[in-house]
């Protein structure tokens, strides 16, 4: 028996921006981080003074007045929806803390936080090969590549004729990625009464009573080789920090930065292998 249900499926695709687009993406992410930290700071200050919870609508009105000042006029260079959603996210995180669902929200550090920002689900546009980012100005010169359309790494991966939900763009330290939810009809098969036994192990991930075996991805030669390279690189980075230590402070040299970039690439490869298994 088949049952049709409407579901939201998340699709994640890598972006291939040019230099100008890359600069713009970082500007959007930094502005979103600033708006998040500002909203969180206002909530903490208000709570310390004995005030009630500030709603995101009140904070957005206050933020609009802040953008009109000369000191913060640079905030107008970024789409309004980016900062609006960042303030909403800060208020949501603050509410979750008081409901006991999560820890107290922390300020986003420029050094350690993941650069990311929101895109309006109505204004964002997709073609077979590109995505149009809201607020990115188009190039006026015919011989220049359009700035507002960013190339997608996978062709025809995201459908162009459907409703999108919660589009987010984030940077993982190597590449930019766009994540978007799409609604689709899923045919769900009603399970039968037949049972199956599953034996979880170390050599094999799982052995089923019907004879099917599922390999443990961590036992493959490729993953073992990458894990060995990772351990050696981690030890090398640790030695570099110790050798360049100045008193009680660790000094990050250009060589350490290169090694940490290689470590990031190794972790990225291992994550992709396990994700696709």
Feature locations, PLM:
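Nucleic-acid substrate recognition interfaces
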Residues: 1-277
